[in-house]
Amino acid sequence: LSPHELFNVAEDVRYLAPEQLSGFEDAFKSWQDAARSNKSVLARQRLHLIFQLLRHTGARLGEILSLDDRTAFDRDRSMVRIKGRNAVREVPIPEEFCEAATNVLDSPMGCGLRGEFFKVDPGYLRRTCYERGRECGLPKELANPRVLRNTRAVEMLRNGVPLAVVKEVLGQSSLDLAAGFQQFTSQD
């Protein structure tokens, strides 16, 4: 047996189960698709894209909101460059998401915000997360950027990604923080 098959997440770590994450993603997508005016379409596209970046990268909210959309994405390698506290790290993202994100950024609506696309009020993004979470039955404490970060970490660990790689992807300076996600029982 591999360690990733045995570990349990510490009780104090809030994260989403796969079906909760799927519901959260669906709620954001439905909300985006329900936009009618050009202004609303753009606002919702921006917030949905930020949500997806949080979901797929495990980055901190501040890291995503400070991205320079002109240089952050590497379409050829399906990567996003995230400036962390001490360095820039390259985080892989799903190819189809990278393509969709760069298409939005290159669209007429996205071009008008070049260099500023991700600069939104963090409180507004959090409130939008709470609202989408409520729509899919998530309690407020599970519908936020921190929980998306934790969820991504748990997802990677459960898929057998080594702890050191998870630490690097999340931009953690020590293994202690990421190690808190893994707990093994004495029988393990």
Regions found by a protein language model. Name each.
Residues 1-30, 82:
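Flexible interdomain linker/hinge and immediately adjacent N-terminus
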Residues 18-60:
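Basic, Lys/Arg- and aromatic-enriched nucleic-acid-binding interface segment
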Residues 21, 43-48, 122, 126, ...:
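Short, leucine-enriched amphipathic alpha-helices that occur as contiguous helical runs
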Residues 21, 94-140:
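Active-site/catalytic core of tyrosine-dependent DNA strand-transfer enzymes
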Residues 33-40, 130-168:
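Short, basic (Lys/Arg/His-rich) helix/loop patches that form interaction surfaces
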Residues 53-63, 159-161, 172:
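A short, glycine-centered helix-capping/turn motif at helix boundaries
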Residues 57, 62, 66-99, 186:
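Conserved tyrosine-mediated DNA breakage-rejoining catalytic core shared by Y-recombinases
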Residues 84-85, 170-188:
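Catalytic-site neighborhood detector that most strongly recognizes the C-terminal catalytic loop/helix
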